[in-house]
Amino acid sequence: MEEDSLYLGGEWQFNHFSKLTSSRPDAAFAEIQRTSLPEKSPLSCETRVDLCDDLAPVARQLAPREKLPLSNRRPAAVGAGLQNMGNTCYVNASLQCLTYTPPLANYMLSREHSQTCHRHKGCMLCTMQAHITRALHNPGHVIQPSQALAAGFHRGKQEDAHEFLMFTVDAMKKACLPGHKQVDHHSKDTTLIHQIFGGYWRSQIKCLHCHGISDTFDPYLDIALDIQAAQSVQQALEQLVKPEELNGENAYHCGVCLQRAPASKMLTLLTSAKVLILVLKRFSDVTGNKIAKNVQYPECLDMQPYMSQPNTGPLVYVLYAVLVHAGWSCHNGHYFSYVKAQEGQWYKMDDAEVTASSITSVLSQQAYVLFYIQKSEWERHSESVSRGREPRALGAEDTDRRATQGELKRDHPCLQAPELDEHLVERATQESTLDHWKFLQEQNKTKPEFNVRKVEGTLPPDVLVIHQSKYKCGMKNHHPEQQSSLLKLSSTTPTHQESMNTGTLASLRGRARRSKGKNKHSKRALLVCQ
């Protein structure tokens, strides 16, 4: 018997025994025997060899790959700007990045989900479908994001854009599931959202005493990068996959030879996502201070050096969106984004203001979140333009339609938010609130093998964590609730307080001027309690 397998709560673990040193025949498998196994292991000897090709060979496919839209449905030109409803720049910046994610946008525009969804009310996929459709089909205008998009998250003050982004992605992933309790962990990783944003980590530990190897695989939806000692994204990725020696006090407790022995540990990507979300760790978890350094990131990124099998040819990704935070700390500042439209032109999406930009400007930002897509995926989802279909540009007609000089044309049908059933917001809030999401994040905390981001109190000092929420406890103590707990869709002129954080109207020529001091009146402290 050469190897055995474990499936532990959404995590695949394999132990390879190239050399058995114990005289007891059952000693090598003591680690396995100490763990309660399911009645039937989801991986058999036949399916293990296909692990790299398909991590879920026997799990129920909730969203088969062939159901992903193969044809492009996105308009070639840039879409609408988003009205800031008061401290919602973090919502707008995140939504724009998701709106211009090609496979997600094409799926939403196909309306495939809403035609079969039996929930409708409280379904984040249905809500995002409505938003993306409105945003992409109304170029030159300003639209109000639906109140349901931030129900349960927005508290009337600025929040972290990355946390809202992952909150939304997680809510969409849950909307793909037919029943939360009836689906096993591994089947959840076959959803449409995981097919787009998800991949698998591989953590391999090799005992230097008996040469036993332990492989553990864990899913991810984003990758956090420590930038304190890195000058570029490539350097941060190299640090992430750098081999680590476990010895002395950090010696590995081997499940094969049952001894504490020196070992080598390596973290690599077993599978890489179609869409790669790279989060640059710019904020201190304790003080909230920002690492305001320039970190270089390329327009094209080769991820092959960081894969478990690095010698299989280039794996090229192209940049299509950048989420930026302007300010000196997480307590204040402003969020905006850059997106690449299907026509290939870059645009700065600053709340309601939409202006054309250049790749030079895009690459010179102090980025917070980077969005990359596999080059082959970008080309496939942009095939209609490459075949010669003339991209639609914003011309005089659009200029006449858009609001100008800071006056919001609220009677324009594009600006009127759809009527929301009061039960929709209530149910969405009940099903997915910020506190509940953070509680689930803590419950499903990444296993120590993948803690590659920060020091854990119960782990050796050189073990790091991939991603951990900045909000863990003391939320109410440090962030008292404000009077407005949800987005308010108002049909009147914004108040002075709202206008301080409200972008100007959509303008591809950038004629409108943004108000100064955005979000500086809404401070918040980020504190992690171990």
Curated annotation (Swiss-Prot):
The active site is at C89 (nucleophile), H334 (proton acceptor). Its main location: nucleus. One of its GO terms (molecular function) is cysteine-type deubiquitinase activity. Residues 510-524 have a biased composition (Basic residues). This is Ubiquitin carboxyl-terminal hydrolase 17-like protein 12. Residues 382-392, 398-412 have a biased composition (Basic and acidic residues). One of its GO terms (biological process) is regulation of protein stability. The gene is USP17L12.
